[in-house]
A protein has these predicted regions:
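Metal-dependent phosphoesterase signature
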Residues: 71-72, 77-105
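Surface-exposed patches in mature extracellular/periplasmic domains of secreted proteins
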Residues: 55-62, 121-126, 151, 176-179
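Non-catalytic pre-domain segments flanking phosphatase-related domains
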Residues: 2-5, 16-64
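Sec-exported extracytoplasmic/periplasmic mature domains
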Residues: 52, 56, 76, 112-120, ...
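Short acidic, Gly/Ser-rich segments with clustered Asp/Glu that frequently serve as metal-coordination loops
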Residues: 67-75, 193-195
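Acidic helix-start/capping segments at beta-turn-to-alpha-helix junctions
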Residues: 62-70, 129-131
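Short, acidic loop-to-helix structural element flanking the phosphoryl-transfer center
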Residues: 94-122, 129-130
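C-terminal cap/substrate-recognition subdomain and adjoining C-terminal extension
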Residues: 25, 31-34, 38, 128-214
Length: 214
């Protein structure tokens, strides 16, 4: 019986290693490396230390991207790789609807801190607004959802992130009823997640070798 158990787990371990080794290096690094885990945790830890020192009032807020900043979608990359496919809007939409993304390492502790400090979070993501309910469902599964959070997802192709950031700064568009906000920190995994004009808030960029513009 003992030999059977050892043999069984050996098969599982071998299958996992074989499957893992078939992944592209970028996905494998995110999924398996201690460096990726450590980097993400360090970024969130540093942000926590920095925000402790920042004066927060009713106008203060942080802007966060979602994918590969808060939500870890490496499983999507694994699945399309197994099928021999590349990214497509159709497969991505199906993945988002499943609401099965995990948390980027360190995110949960950071969100717990943000909730205690009562800091407003504004999510600016290129997820389509029609999939807001699935995104909220995913956040609830991960126990980081808060009804006070603001989600500015993409309405259409022309609805770029800088447009939505400007609405936050000026209290226009979808922010008209809420009013303008003073951004004390930005979080993202790509340069498009950060402001070139309004750079008063600190910027925290997460490693994402799986996709991007370069």
């Amino acid at each position: 019986m003992k030999k059977s158990i050892i043999f069984y787990f050996s098969i599982i371990a071998f299958s996992f290693c074989a499957s893992s080794s078939n992944l592209p290096n970028d996905v494998r690094w995110v999924v398996n490396s201690g460096e990726y885990d450590k980097l993400c945790r360090q970024i969130y830890s540093q942000a926590t230390e920095d925000l402790v020192k920042v004066f927060i009032d009713g106008q203060s807020a942080i802007i966060m991207d979602l994918d590969e900043t808060v939500l870890d979608n490496s499983q999507y990359q694994i699945e399309i790789n197994e099928k021999g496919e590349s990214f497509s809007m159709i497969s991505w939409a199906k993945w988002v609807l499943r609401a099965e993304a995990k948390l980027v390492p360190g995110a949960k502790h950071f969100f717990d801190f943000i909730r205690k400090r009562n800091i407003q979070i504004i999510f600016i993501s290129n997820r389509m607004n029609e999939r807001l309910s699935s995104t909220v469902k995913n956040m609830k599964k991960l126990n980081i959802y808060n009804e006070k959070d603001i989600y500015l997802l993409r309405l259409d192709k022309a609805d770029k992130k800088y447009i939505r950031r400007n609405e936050v700064y000026t209290g226009t568009g979808r922010m008209r009823a809420i009013g303008s906000k003073k951004i004390v920190a930005y979080f993202g995994d790509a340069m498009g997640d950060f402001s070139l004009k309004n750079s008063l808030g600190k910027e925290y960029i997460f490693p994402n070798p799986m996709y991007g513009k370069w």
